Amino acid sequence: MEESMRKYYLAIDIGASSGRHVVGWREDGEIKAKEVYRFPNGVQEQDGHLIWDIDALLSHVKAGIAAARTEFSSIISLSIDTWGVDYVLLRGEVHVLPVYAYRDSRTEAVIPQVYSILPFSELYRRTGIQFQPFNTIYQLYADKLAGRLEGVTDFLMLPEYLLWRLCGIKAKEYTNATTTGLVSAKSGEFDAEIISRLGLPPMFPKLQKPGALLGEYEGIQCVLCATHDTASAVEGIPMEENAPYISSGTWSLLGVKTPKPLTDAASQATNYSNEGGVDYNRYQKNIMGMWLVNRLKDELCPQMPFPEIVKLAEDSGFDETVDANAPEFLSPVSMKAAFDAALDRKPQSVGDYFRCAYRSLAFSYGEALAELEANTGSRYDRLYIVGGGAKNDFLNQLTARVTGKQIIALPIEATALGNLKIQMEADQ
């Protein structure tokens, strides 16, 4: 196809540490992509809480769109994906500040109160969502107890909020909504019983599926992709067969596609989650991921390139491990101190800390994969790894050794590719 006739699409993929704008097009039957804009992201501390600068995110979204149009004049559509669970409250057309980040500790005190109304066993049976202290259900109940829901007329998950600010159309997208812990595993819609018993306001309409068209932003069609980044990432993995995957970033999401949710006792006991996919269920588990490594780097050797860090880890003889999913690693003041406190024998060098982190991640992958196979009754030969962590050969080797699987490491922007794929299919 001549370049002048080519259709271009824009994926805006925002992670907890950075965001990127990626323009994609079809060429020779494949999706080609080019990153045109990248920006930093991160939580900020305000009044003892962790928050997102939502206005800065919107500014970067618009700046990246302008950068994309400078290079690619005929962009057909755009879509936005981010991490799950976080949201913006609205009073009419005005957003309520602050926009809390999932690593904030405000939910800790309210979780027992939620369980006094809805025991976790009932919540899991109804929603199939694994326990995480930051799930939207606990955040919204914390808002209720703090009086933040007074006068609130709506809430939008972060990507849907940003899309609304671009095109003026509000929507609640299915894959991201499933991360709230408020969606019925049976119906695929918000669970009215849960919402009623928690006394939440009437702001839970019918959900929309990936591919739905919204309004326009400066002549560009806004589309709902799978706005939860992991759901888009799974769409972007070029699997030859259905096999387990790890979407490896700040979090490592390990899972497999299943026809329907699994909400049995074994799934609950092993803390597996059932999240929305594009016409399938994602049976998966959140694992702490590169958060451990990145925080250690920030603290121990902020200027050291990752290849040097990996070499130090490879050369270290330190073989102790920690529970990578332990709550003390979620948001510690010092990641080094958190490792020290969790280990009987303390690391003696920078390489020791990173070797411990990488080995701990590999063992957590192995444990989670064994649980997945037991719970689904299926055995797999391959494990696909995408995202930033797929570039780490040392971690891939450790994972292969622990799991006994053939590792298919694809250092691709799977999330952006999935986002683009959904837009292209919506344009058919």
Please name every model-derived segment.
Residues 1-97, 125, 151, 196, ...:
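N-terminal glycine/serine-rich phosphate-binding loop of ATP-dependent small-molecule kinases
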Residues 10-11, 115-127, 141-153, 157, ...:
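Active-site core segments that coordinate phosphate-bearing ligands/cofactors
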Residues 18, 209-215, 380-398:
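Glycine-rich phosphate-binding loops at beta-strand->alpha-helix junctions
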Residues 19-24, 86-90, 181, 232-236, ...:
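Short beta-strand scaffold segments in enzyme catalytic cores
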Residues 66, 70-102, 127-134, 163-184, ...:
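Short beta-strand-loop/turn "lid" adjacent to the catalytic site in phosphate-handling enzymes
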Residues 74-82, 375-387:
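Short glycine-rich phosphate-binding loop at a beta-alpha junction
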Residues 104-117:
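Short alpha-helix plus adjacent loop in nuclease-associated cores
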Residues 135-141:
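A charged, well-structured terminal subsegment
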